[in-house]
């Protein structure tokens, strides 16, 4: 067998069935949609239940989206160990080093893990445990 003699496996390459292209095609006229009726004509919207009150309208409304909500990028203490002892950690430095992807509405430092270095950390918010851990190592937690 040579390269120009290669053929696809039997039945692996089926021709697309084009519906509604004449009666002799086997799928003309009604194009596989049956006889008259709602489903033969147009489309029904997503979640349509045949005129019955749809599920999403039977359920009660709940909650709301607070337009003033602030979403903070989270940084834990254990990730701050990547920086050198005595370094000043800023939001720009965190983005540059790839610890966070986006600054969002600010940065919040949480106290997960242990901090082994003396750092000056500048962020929008600190949890109480994170602030305590940074200051116990001789560092500073500055709110910007």
UniProtKB/Swiss-Prot annotation:
GO biological process, one term: translation
GN (gene name): rplO
PANTHER family: 50S RIBOSOMAL PROTEIN L15, LARGE RIBOSOMAL SUBUNIT PROTEIN UL15M
Recorded GO MF terms: rRNA binding; structural constituent of ribosome
Pfam families reported for this sequence: Ribosomal_L27A
Family annotation (PROSITE patterns): RIBOSOMAL_L15
Start-end of Gly residues biased regions: 23-35
HAMAP family in UniProt: Ribosomal_uL15
Lineage per the UniProt record: Bacteria, Bacillati, Bacillota, Bacilli, Lactobacillales
GO cellular component terms, semicolon-separated: cytosolic large ribosomal subunit
Residues covered by region (Disordered): 1-52
Family: Belongs to the universal ribosomal protein uL15 family.
Compositional bias per record (Basic and acidic residues), positions renumbered to this chain: 1-10
Keywords, sorted A to Z: Ribonucleoprotein, Ribosomal protein, RNA-binding, rRNA-binding
Organism expressing this protein natively: Ligilactobacillus salivarius (strain UCC118) (Lactobacillus salivarius)
Described purpose of this protein according to its UniProt entry: Binds to the 23S rRNA.
Name this protein carries in UniProt: Large ribosomal subunit protein uL15
The keyword Ribonucleoprotein appears for this protein: yes
Subunit structure: Part of the 50S ribosomal subunit.
